[in-house]
Amino acid sequence: MKSRAAVAFGPGLPLEIVEIDVAPPKKGEVLVKISHTGVCHTDAYTLSGDDPEGLFPVVLGHEGAGVVVEVGEGVTSVKPGDHVIPLYTAECGECDFCTSGKTNLCVAVRETQGKGVMPDATSRFFVNGQPLYHYMGCSTFSEYTVVAEVSLAKINPQANAEQVCLLGCGVTTGIGAVHNTAKVQEGDSVAVFGLGGIGLAVVQGARQAKAGRIFAIDTNPSKFELAKQFGATDCINPNDYDKPVQQVLVEMTKWGVDHTFECIGNVNVMRSALESAHRGWGQSVIIGVAGAGKEISTRPFQLVTGRVWKGTAFGGVKGRTQLPGMVEDAMSGKIELAPFVTHTMELDKINEAFDLMHDGKSIRTVIHY
C-alpha cells in the first residue's frame, strides 16, 4: 500500500514528505489510517539527534488517532472501522509488569519497539525498496501505519479525533501524573515547572484533584494566561527574581510545595523542582525527558529530610483499559482539550509545526491528513 509520510532521513534535517510503501499487517498487527496527529517535543528530541535510542531514517510521530483498515492473523480486540489511538506504552495484560498491578510499563513489545521495528524484528515501511524505522511503536507521521494489537486503544467513534489524538501522549501524561503517580489530594499545593502541553495538562489535572494553590512556572510569560484558564492560582517567571526559584517557592509556602512536577527535561530544573518540595513529605515527579548522558543531582539531605523523587511514563495510565475512559471524559468536558490545539495544518507543512514549537508559539499543532 502507498502512503504519504513525513520521513526523517537524518538527525537535524527537515522532515521530507515522500510516498512510502506500507506492508500489510502480520500476526498480531493492525493497519491503521491516521486522521490526525499531534507534534510533540519528544518527536523534536529524537529528530535533534539527542535521543540515545534515535534511529534514522525513521517515520516519527506518536500522538495520533485513526481508524482500523485491516487486521493481521489472530487480532481479536479491534476490527476494520474501529476508531483507535496508537499507544507508545503497550498493554498486553500478560507480562510480569502488566500483571503486577504496580505499573503501566508493559514489556511485551519494548525490546523491538526500542529498535525501531515490529515484534518480528522487521519493518513495515519502505521507501525505494529500503526499510524505514518505526517510532515508539506508532509512527503517526504516516497516513497509514502498522501497529501491534497490544499498542492500540479502541475509542468511542464519536470522539473528536483532532482533539483526542492528544490523549496519545501529552495530555494523558500530565493528567495521569497528577492522579496516578503523585495522587494529589484535595487542598494539596502543586508546582508545575514548564508550561508546554504536558505542564498545562498537569495544571488541569491538579484542578480536577481540587488542589489548593497551583503554581505555574515558566520563563515564557505568554503561557500564563492559558495556565490560569486551566486552574493555576500563581504564575511565576524565574527570571523576575534574583534568587533561585526553589527559594522563592519555599518562601511563598513556608515549607515548600506538596507536589512538584518537572515537565521540561532539564536536569537543573529537576533539582529546583525537588528542592521546592515540602520538607517532611513533599514529592517531586519527573516527567520531562533529559538529553542523552544527562544526570540528576541534589544534596542527599534533601531526601533525608523527607522529600521523594519519582518518575512517570504516560502518566501511569494503562492505555488499552484506561485511555478509552479518558476519551469519554474529554467528550463530556471533564477533560478540556480544545485549548491545547493552538494550530492545525496539513502534512506538507509539518516542519512549520516544529518551528512553532521551538519558538514557543504553540502548545500543540495537530496535523490532519
From Swiss-Prot:
EC class: oxidoreductase
Molecular function in Gene Ontology: alcohol dehydrogenase (NAD+) activity; S-(hydroxymethyl)glutathione dehydrogenase (NAD+) activity; S-(hydroxymethyl)glutathione dehydrogenase (NADP+) activity; S-nitrosoglutathione reductase (NADH) activity; zinc ion binding
Catalytic activity, as annotated: S-(hydroxymethyl)glutathione + NADP(+) = S-formylglutathione + NADPH + H(+); S-(hydroxymethyl)glutathione + NAD(+) = S-formylglutathione + NADH + H(+); a primary alcohol + NAD(+) = an aldehyde + NADH + H(+); a secondary alcohol + NAD(+) = a ketone + NADH + H(+)
Function: Has high formaldehyde dehydrogenase activity in the presence of glutathione and catalyzes the oxidation of normal alcohols in a reaction that is not GSH-dependent. In addition, hemithiolacetals other than those formed from GSH, including omega-thiol fatty acids, also are substrates. Also acts as a S-nitroso-glutathione reductase by catalyzing the NADH-dependent reduction of S-nitrosoglutathione.
Family stated for the protein in its record: Belongs to the zinc-containing alcohol dehydrogenase family. Class-III subfamily.
PANTHER family xrefs: ALCOHOL DEHYDROGENASE, ALCOHOL DEHYDROGENASE CLASS-3
Name of the protein in its database record: S-(hydroxymethyl)glutathione dehydrogenase
Species of origin: Photobacterium damsela subsp. piscicida
Gene from which this protein is expressed: frmA
